[in-house]
Structures are given as C-alpha cells and as structure tokens.
Amino acid sequence: MRLIKAFLVQLLLLPIFFYKRFISPLTPPSCRFTPSCSSYAIEALRKYGPGKGLLLSIKRILRCHPWGGSGYDPVP
C-alpha cells in the first residue's frame, strides 16, 4: 500500500515539476501567496500523500485569484 501511495505522489508531482521547469519561467510571477502554489502543492503532496495533499493543493489554487487572499500561507 505504501508503494502505491508513493507512486501516486510521484505521478502527481510530474506535472507540477513540468510546470515549474518549462512554463513558469515564461510567465510573470502571479501567485499571491508565499510559498507559491506549485511549491505548496509539492510540499502538501509529500507531507500528506495523494489524498489529502491533492485536496489541499486544489483548495489553495482555488483561493489564488485577484479577489482571494494573499500573504504567507504554509502547508498545515
């Protein structure tokens, strides 16, 4: 079971690493939070696994808009 969870985490991290490596450098910084949403997602997935980590990441991304919050928002 732990092997499956670890595999799922790595699978979910792949698009985030792709985004950080190839897409993010081409766009101006736009995340309103510290750490950035992609860094938050990486930390949440590594800390909580695929279930809770993915849920926390999605909730954070949904809060990251011009009328949402801003500032320091660490992974709980």
UniProtKB/Swiss-Prot annotation:
Protein localization: Cell inner membrane
User: Source organism's superkingdom?
Assistant: Bacteria
- Main location group: membrane
The disulfide bonds in this chain are none
Task: Extract the SMART domains matched here.
Answer: Haemolytic
List the GO terms this entry assigns under cellular component, sorted alphabetically. plasma membrane
Keywords, in A-Z order: Cell inner membrane, Cell membrane, Membrane
Q: What membrane topology term does the record carry?
A: Peripheral membrane protein
| UniProt-listed InterPro entries | Membr_insert_effic_factor_YidD
Q: Which family does it belong to?
A: Belongs to the UPF0161 family.
- PANTHER family noted in UniProt: MEMBRANE PROTEIN INSERTION EFFICIENCY FACTOR-RELATED (PTHR33383:SF1)
Against HAMAP family, the record matches this protein to: UPF0161_YidD
Q: What does this protein do?
A: Could be involved in insertion of integral membrane proteins into the membrane.
Q: What is the name listed in the Swiss-Prot or TrEMBL entry for this protein?
A: Putative membrane protein insertion efficiency factor
Question: What is the protein's species of origin?
Answer: Porphyromonas gingivalis (strain ATCC BAA-308 / W83)
